[in-house]
């Protein structure tokens, strides 16, 4: 039997395509080693994407991390030790016994929109925070302000109802930056500040880019362009650094590999502390934990150093109270409760628990909490306290632990600066109430001089430690990594800011990663929205609509209009049912979206204003009807998180997910069909056994593992492609496909294995049919029999599998999207679920239901086109 000459040609074409996709880094903007692009552009990796870009409306640490000091500035700023320094206010005076603050503003300052920063703008900024409908999460910090007055264009007066010793510290927070009256309403998507960088572009799910502010009132930045890239997965962060896709990573999320970068001369590293106190939170409303002896026993049972070594791989600073070690007022109280299990057992016996007791430890999602929980549970077990661990998602944790106080213990990090005053709140989730502690907080708020405040701060620390309010574990570490040629990149310990105002490359670097991954922002509009081209979506939509129309016309012609109308009716009924089911499930899911958005320190007034703004104060039924009515008009609603239309969000993500799914399906089909045909033709032979074994391996290998392997080989070792990310279709077809080829291949391999096995089985079954024997009797060769007679009759189950695979690949690729940090639909859905962005979850699920039902409908109609027997039945 002579083999078909087409097979080697097909293999050659596939091989050539692979070489073009993987072997032409210049065409796709692939990276080289660190320091291989333009010397005045930098890309910084960060783990979290900011939900909006207005620091005055959301407490997300990611907003402060990238915007504070770079785009926005405040009247004052924090020094590294927590003291207050001038910024937009060059000096200030405190008079009237601490009841009046007069700020003298820096001259010649302008906002990025060209408007002047003066006392009127400063008054607008503070009045906006204090307004009754304000959604500022830290509004309560300025509650003692009675009036804000303009003295002259460069002088601002703030009057208080009573002394506020922490006012200057509060004004240094990111929530109180100065905003332009003319553009403040649009800051959520197009931020306008006074900083050394201007906002340029936000590619949601992928990156945010700033450009140098040439009119900056201070010393201009040396970098012309800065891009912050969102990389949530620790393995992806590692790969992005090693491949040179990013020049730096702020708060590197994988402490287990940090030492490798510290030993690599290509990188510089920094280990420091943050404002986040990691504590074993105790609910003193629960009987055993309300006893001081029990709480002290727990403190003696904890071995902080073992917890740090096991949970944080040795990075972190032991603490003995709720206070950051980098603050000048810090008091080291770790020696108050040394690790002493015998002492712990003695205290438990004295409290009436000689045999210990049982508790539940509810843990939020972060890895530090889960790893610490394992160690804490083991240490408490040594003194007789039996711990049952329960893992929660953030929304569940906020609902059960923080809001309803339904917990015994929890482990969580408190990241807000100067947040020791939370222990003075009786309604706080710890359940701690102390008249003496409240008196200390009141005295601190009434004290203005630094020595007096320092003494009171140390008394506050000692009181919390003596009362063993919580098990104080460690100050969360700050782990930063950057290109060794990148100088003067500063990382703030208090607000977590990545300060790029002085950053620059030394003479040994020819470029930063931004130069490798794109040509800067000479592309696209700088309007602040995602500038990815909608053309691929429009083309795909037009193509799918044309295919659907053709299939519908064929079905109507062969089976009649009644059949087609019936199928369309089933599709419509399914969608209507899906909207109701999805809405109900989302509404009964635990977790308050407003609490998630506003954080643990938000005051009730700001939360109520936000709830009203989002329409969450409306009853469920009217809200459902309003949503469905919008769907009928093509309006999916507005995202709680991003504050933009959900339809726009979905369209942006489909520009990645739809081509990714199509490319993965194309690759899986191109691999599966030859494998199945060869295996079926040579069934029972050695080649069949080898191919069957390969498909079995394809089923067994997880696609995310394969994806990481591909990244390590082609991005980290060979530097042929980027480790991840998506440059946008505006960067060119080659760049877009180059970014999708590895994730598509990782997705395609398991799907190809499934498809090959299904097709092989269908072909073997078909080869026993009478018409196959007839074809052979007429002299047809084996390959002709397979290709012309067996394959068309075996395609029905294959089409079913292909339809299911496309639906899965469209939104089920969330793990691969995280590995390759792609801004796809699956990642959007996952983030929306975690963030309790209900309207996005509802809309994405309904869209996916529509996709699944539509694809299934089209697959059913396509059966008559590929199967000769069905065509004959249709004609009959």
Model-identified regions with their sequence ranges:
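N-terminal lobe/hinge region of extracytoplasmic solute-binding protein
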Residues: 45-96, 127, 190-194
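Detector for C-terminal structural segments
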Residues: 203, 301-329, 368-377, 395-527
